[in-house]
């Protein structure tokens, strides 16, 4: 009988979930609003509901969780979460799910899961050392040695959004939310109007304000990625997050920035790629993380 796995990707805005077969095929998938403001206990209840729904329809061998926040991967619990998800810190996914359903469960940080997905079946196949960045409302990072996530001493390696840059930090200067804020302020308009997609569409038409704001973001990304490359020496750098769907526009600009800030001998040995798995990365990565442990 084919073994199936429930895979759940918990983000600040949406929970993506589905069933994945043992060979990595996604058999079914869906999503729901996280309703993060309701807090950790309500998210746990949503996860219970998802698992119970699929237990009625499939023979489930394991539960795979990808989640925002810092994760103790041994205990399978959140040891730090942003205030945007109240009462999420301390959520014991592994303990609660294994106790309730007697099915093995593994939990991993969402950016680490995205990195695993890209390394195993996406943009960084066969990479010896991989650096993965996701750029969205904030900025997250992941380091992989072959197919293994580097967690650091206490499971907080590569929290790159908090890196200090100039008089601020990386995600305060380089995230998509800052791009929208800059354009809206310079145009004396509403931030809601200027989402990433709209900004890039106008930049392609020659809008000077949008072009300048994107170039400023690329400069920040270039400096940060170059500094990370000096420390980690990755073979492949993978960029993900919604804004990175604009790869045709961004890739030459980011490559130029890396050439500016990296020594030529390092730049020529560092490959820049854009994430392939898009919205499925978290679910796939959670599945790969589970399979690595079982």
Label each PLM-derived region with a short phrase.
Residues 107-111:
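Short loop/edge segments at beta-strand edges and connector loops
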Residues 77-90:
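A charged helix-plus-loop insertion that forms the helical arch/lid used to bind
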Residues 21-22, 67, 145-146:
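A cytosolic small-molecule/anion-sensing beta-strand core signal
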Residues 125-177:
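Glycine-rich phosphate-binding loop of actin/hexokinase-like ATP-binding domains
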Residues 34-35, 86, 157-159:
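A short acidic/small-residue loop/turn micro-motif
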Residues 30-32, 82, 153:
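Short hydrophobic alpha-helix segments
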Residues 1-62, 72-77, 99-105, 117-127, ...:
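ATP-binding/phosphotransfer module of carbohydrate and carboxylate kinases, centering on a glycine-rich
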Residues 68-71, 136-138, 243:
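Short glycine-rich anion-binding loops that position phosphate/pyrophosphate groups of nucleotides
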